[in-house]
Amino acid sequence: MGQKINPIGFRLGTTQGHHSLWFAQPKNYSEGLQEDKKIRTYIQNYVQKNMKTSSGVEGIARIEIQKRIDLIQIIIYMGFPKILIESRPRGIEELQMNLQKEFHSVNRKLNIAITRIEKPYGNPNILAEFIAGQLKNRVSFRKAMKKAIELTEQADTKGIQVQIAGRIDGKEIARVEWIREGRVPLQTIRAKIDYCCYTVRTIYGVLGIKIWIFIDGE
């Protein structure tokens, strides 16, 4: 059996960049990581609570955290920032204040910026949320996968692979189903491949969604 490595970690420093940019003393490193995890979870929960979308897609592609001695800069890359801004006009300021209180960053200023990504459905996280929403609404998994592939074709990607694992359609025996369109060269480090794994809770149990998107490169 081939041992599968995380495609993003495999390409760090070549086609992929880090999502956390800061330095710390070795003894404080774990604290910094935990803080990052809490910040990301807090932002995701806030967006989930305040976004009114019919599709159930939050649209967060990634959250970048840059830390300096006196400043924590958080950049949220979103596919549909307009929905968040329209549903809560002062949402960003509110989120900033809540985060500052939550993490007691008295000595450090906390700044949040939102960046819109041009082709939302070219991002695996947003696509996984879309598929999860479809599965929760009891849409057939094959239909959901095909619709996701159609959406990525509009985003000019070179290839996509979607995998769903678990008790699909409520069957008693768990199985893995996958579909691939175009090329997905996982062994080529120069190929820019975006990846995500996402867990969705349905009435039949938990399903795992994995998506690989080949953007460009080689």
From Swiss-Prot:
Domain KH type-2: start-end pairs: 47-118
Top-level taxon in the UniProt lineage: Eukaryota
Keyword Translocase set for record: no
Keyword RNA-binding: yes
PROSITE patterns, per database record: KH_TYPE_2, RIBOSOMAL_S3
Any single GO CC term annotated in Swiss-Prot or TrEMBL for this entry: chloroplast
GO molecular function: rRNA binding; structural constituent of ribosome
GO biological process terms, semicolon-separated: translation
Pfam families per the UniProt record, alphabetical: Ribosomal_S3_C
Location within or outside the cell: Plastid, Chloroplast
Keywords carried by this UniProt record: Chloroplast, Plastid, Ribonucleoprotein, Ribosomal protein, RNA-binding, rRNA-binding
Homology family: Belongs to the universal ribosomal protein uS3 family.
Assembly: Part of the 30S ribosomal subunit.
Protein name: Small ribosomal subunit protein uS3c
Organism: Lactuca sativa (Garden lettuce)
UniProt lineage: Eukaryota, Viridiplantae, Streptophyta, Embryophyta, Tracheophyta
Encoding gene, per UniProt annotation: rps3
